[in-house]
Amino acid sequence: PACTSGGEPAARARPAAAPACGNGVYTWSDVDRRSVLTGVAEKQTLGEGGGALTHEVRPLRTPRVAVDFDRGPRIDAKAVLRSLGARTGDVGADGDATGFTDVHRPAPDPRTGGTEMEGAGTFVTYSWVEQVVADFQYTCGSGERSTGRATSWVVDGSGVLECSVPVEGAKEGDPALAAARFSCGPHAPAAAPGEGRPVRRASS
């Protein structure tokens, strides 16, 4: 066996997995785009005249930019994400300007800056991202296939809701409803879908 300079046997290198062909075709399925809750603060009650919201948003979910392979030869993750971005319109002809294909992209900080409320109420601050997830199949001319799932996110933001007021236009799956159920309680008016007051929401 080969030895290192110190006389110790060198570890045998494991053969790398064979890469997939470079001119294959992607087929995408189950493409899902939705806003997901990434952090929420404990509810905070303010008296008449309002005041500053000081409860810190606690992380619940860390957004990912990643490719998980199920079977077949591995493909460059950035190439997979570039194909997904082209499919969803998040990567244009001029390239990736948002970090959609960057597997080293840092997750957004769920903590928000100080927010001042003008009136009384019980408030909850929360953060969210718009996430894109899809399954793919990559097929080479020889018929060899690779399959897996790609995940990325395109925008992040934050919002403030009032527990006793339904969120305007809220639907099942909305981050505002998830935040209300988490911090206000499942029976709070803000936790139910329906018409109500607009949520205070700011995208970054």
Question: Language-model segments: which ranges?
Answer:
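Core pore-forming/fusogenic effector modules of secreted, proteolytically activated toxins
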Residues: 6-61, 99-204
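Membrane-inserting effector segments that mediate pore formation, membrane fusion
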Residues: 54-108
